[in-house]
Every structure is written in structure tokens, then in C-alpha cells.
């Protein structure tokens, strides 16, 4: 069978024969009738797996470099772009049947995705969700593997939403997902920016590149888009505004923007404020989650919900019912008053925001337990140490997912930013570090464990090792005394 009999591309896009049974970039997922797209990645080149894919039943191969194979090979200038186009064609271009919302930014993306989905659902809008924690398609709920899935998975999730009768999809969009074309062939009706702070410079090299990668989401707004919702207090706001392809741009913030929070009262477990800019008069709001950063997230959610047709008062009132986000500010306490918090904060800005929030929880010392990913931006490591030392009296450095790096070297690079007067230790075993912090903390102290949130494994030299921070917290609290929920309605630390 010739390539043209199986698939071809014209001005309208790719056309696939009924003989095609699927599209994938992973040779291990190939089944008879599949198209295998050979993608060059950071560690592996898909062209090296063409033989394996053909033996598994691939009927055609798409790639950038010709490879001798007993099946048709279609050469393309960009394998990743072709992968997105082929996946969309295979699943019947599901995004065209949905109102798609994209949420990007360094910190806060997952919370905004979860909370906007909740607000839309409470307003009667049938909404699916793709986040870095979970995917909900209307047909099923499953754990996420990447912040933004590879395009064959993402297109399948959108197809399930369409086929389940959902009308809206809220997608967490990472800078990697944008640059690697994972969101290719998806037109967005609304794009949201939380913030842009230091992250992923191992991949983007400069903050300018990183910011411009985020801005590309706003270029994907469809002509009939509801517009963009951006953090007007963020330094990247003007760049994002300039890249918005369609619709009005609505800014939100505490200091700038069309939608603002005034009369802000940050309380230990919640926040109260008045939302201005969504109607003729200010709307009182209560948010059952701590921290100034969550006020920003809530403003983004309310502004976006109104752009999507939710009545302003209803959108703001729903903020009071927003549920916990897995791995974000999960709180437990010991009977003698030690508070333990598990959070995903993994950037200097995110860590600082989390520490500022927990400072309000109790009067005692703050203990932090964290590490840094191996193979990632090394420049942020001492900055993380400086941020931790600014708030915490005790800093316990440990492993995150070191990958192929030496955990002791990673810890030393973080420790370079920690002044000598701060109690700083390196305990390689993460569960042991958590145990030590919980056992040595005194009543009234706070133990903040960050970097991994709900993740269930650590990676050492390509090997995944089970490790759940919340489980380690429960074990440590059991040694000290039974764990109790910290506050009615708060999420207890458990997996």
C-alpha cells in the first residue's frame, strides 16, 4: 500500500484512510494499523525505533529524516507539528466542537484549572478538565502524566469530552506543551495567564524565551474568542496583551487591571475581599484558601468565568465554595499543635508565596523540607535556598527527583543561598527528612514540605521509586501522635 493510499495532506489538512487505526509517537504503543511519528526528543530519537514500530504493526512512518522501512515513510519539516495534525485528524478535530480554555503561567495554573472548572460546572456548563494532576473527560477520570499531554493523548481526551456531551474544556498549558506543539490544532476561545517567574531555564535558556513561549498561547485564540484574561500586576502583562490574537483582553490584579480586589483581608485560613470590575458595583468575596497568591488565582477564575457567560455575582459567590486542589496546601496537625503542610511549590516565587501563607497559620518556627529536580534549571537552586532562609528557621534539604544528578550536589547548590545562621541540613532520604522535621518541631511550629505535591514517585537514574509526601507525613505524625485535620473543610494530608 502506498503512502497516498493511507494518508495525504492538502490545503485542508491531513486525510487518513479507514485502514489507519491510530497515531502515536511511542513505539511501545503501536498496534496493527497505526501511524508511527518519529519525533526527535531531548534524550531519544524516534527514528531509532522505526523498526520496532513496524514490527508492532505500523502501516506508515512520519518523520523528519528518511529511514529505510518496509512501510511508507512520509517526510515532514516538523514531526511534532505533523503529530498534532495527524492526531487531530484521527480523532475528528474535537476541539472544533468545544469551547476551549487554556491556562498558562509559572505558578497557579493547576488551581485556576480546577477552580474554573468548578465554577463553570456549578453554573450548569458541562466542562471537562486537563490538568497536571488529573484529567476529567465526562467518560472517565484518570491521573495525569504530563502538565500538558502529548498531542495524541490530548486529542483523545478532547474527543471523549465531545462524545460525552460536554461543551467546554479547560486545559493546563505548559511552556513545553506550547513549544513542542502538543496544543497544535487546538483553537482557544479564552487564554488565561497567571504569572511568569523563573522556571525551566534549562529548556528555554532565557527568561525572554520563556515569556515568549507562554505568549504563543495567546496567538492561538480563534477569531470568535472570548478573549484573554491576564495578571495585570505581572511584569509580562504587556507582552501577553500584544500577542492576543482576538477578543478583548481583561486584566486582573491587586494594583492594576480592569478586575481588582480591594479591601483585602488575608486571614490564616482564608481571604476576604471585594471584587471590582465585574459589574456596576463591588461584589463581596470569600475565598476558603490562604495566601495572597490564591487571591490572584481567584480573580483569574472569576474574570474568566464571566467572559464565558457566568453571571458576575454567581461567579464571585462560587469562590466561597472552591474545593481543595490535590497537593496544594494540604494541611494536617499533631494533637500537640504542630502544623504540617504539603504543597507543590517548586519555584523561588512559589516557595516564597507558600511560606508567606503558612506564616499566618501559627506563631512558632517554620521548618521547610524540599529539594530540586535533577537535570533542571540549576540557577534557581541557590535562589530557592535564599527564599527558604528568609522565612524558615530550619531548612531540611532532601531529594526531589534527582534523575541522573547526585542528590548531595543538588543540595549543596541550594545550600549556597542559605546563610550560616540558619539551621540547614541535608537528609537524602525524603521520608526520613519529613520524619525528622515533624519529630523535632515544637508545638506551634509549622512544617512546610514542598516541591512534589501529589506526585507518587521519585526518579533516580531512570527508575521510579514510590514516594508520596502525604503518606510520609501520616507516618511521621503517627510516631508523634495521631494526625488530626487542621481546620474544618481543609484537606487533610493523605494520598
Name these PLM-found stretches.
Residues 41-42, 175-176, 198-199, 234-235, ...:
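Short glycine-rich anion-binding loops that position phosphate/pyrophosphate groups of nucleotides
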Residues 51-52, 56-57, 62, 72, ...:
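P-loop/Walker A phosphate-binding loop and immediately adjacent motor/lid segment at beta-alpha junctions
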Residues 446-479:
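Glycine/aspartate-rich loop-and-adjacent alpha/beta segment that forms the canonical ThDP
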Residues 41-44, 324-327, 349-420, 430, ...:
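Active-site beta-alpha connecting loops in nucleotide-dependent enzymes
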Residues 55, 59-65, 227-232, 367-371, ...:
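Short internal beta-strands
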Residues 63-70, 188-340, 415-425, 488-493:
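Acidic, Mg2+-coordinating active-site environments of NTP-dependent enzymes
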Residues 1-89, 227, 235, 260-263, ...:
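N-terminal leader/targeting and accessory segments in enzymes
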Residues 82-232, 238-246, 299, 308, ...:
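Phosphate-binding loop of NTP-binding sites
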